[in-house]
């Protein structure tokens, strides 16, 4: 994602991808909203240095971006969790939006976008259901999001092949 286009996560779950993308977009450091860290208790912890570093980071935050990040999920429970997680990063409420919607019915936003999706791997649903889901997801993405950039996170190689999408790049990642 180049941070110059709308980002869409059609199976957002708890909203992690959307929220972390929003933080990257606005240059908000990880952990910025935390009030305490374990290193505060270290013997040589320098509170004044910490305040200086934190203020420097604050000065680099840019909330003026005109980009919108959309997360959707079929499960309303996931949307509630996503919204609760977004409450922990209040500066992003103008940028990140969550809604309940089936990924297979999701419309592409106007203009160019990047879709990042982490579909179910088959750990919580049956193998046959995963196969059908990946086939239908591939069809929908090809039709509705044609011409846009797509990133898929999955450890289920067999299911990924069912998407029937042209692969430009592949990366091995450790998730978790």
Q: What is each stretch, according to the model?
A:
Residues 101-176:
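C-terminal catalytic and target-recognition region of SAM-dependent MTase-like enzymes
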Residues 1-107, 123-124, 131-133:
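Conserved S-adenosyl-L-methionine
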């Amino acid at each position: 994602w180049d941070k110059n286009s709308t980002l869409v996560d059609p199976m957002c779950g708890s909203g992690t991808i959307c929220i972390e993308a929003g933080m990257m977009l606005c240059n908000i450091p990880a952990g910025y909203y935390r009030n305490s860290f374990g290193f505060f208790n270290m013997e040589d912890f320098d509170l004044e240095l910490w305040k200086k570093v934190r203020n420097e980071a604050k000065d680099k935050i840019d909330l003026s971006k005109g980009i919108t990040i959309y997360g959707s999920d079929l499960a309303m429970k996931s949307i509630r969790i996503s919204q609760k997680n977004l409450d922990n990063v209040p500066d992003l409420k103008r940028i990140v939006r969550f809604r309940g919607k089936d990924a297979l019915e999701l419309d592409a936003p106007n203009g160019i976008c990047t879709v990042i999706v982490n579909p179910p791997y088959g750990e919580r649903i049956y193998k046959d259901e995963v196969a059908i889901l990946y086939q239908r997801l591939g069809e929908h993405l090809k039709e509705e999001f044609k011409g846009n950039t797509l990133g898929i996170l999955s450890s289920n190689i067999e299911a990924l092949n069912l998407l029937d999408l042209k692969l430009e790049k592949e990366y091995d990642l450790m998730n978790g």
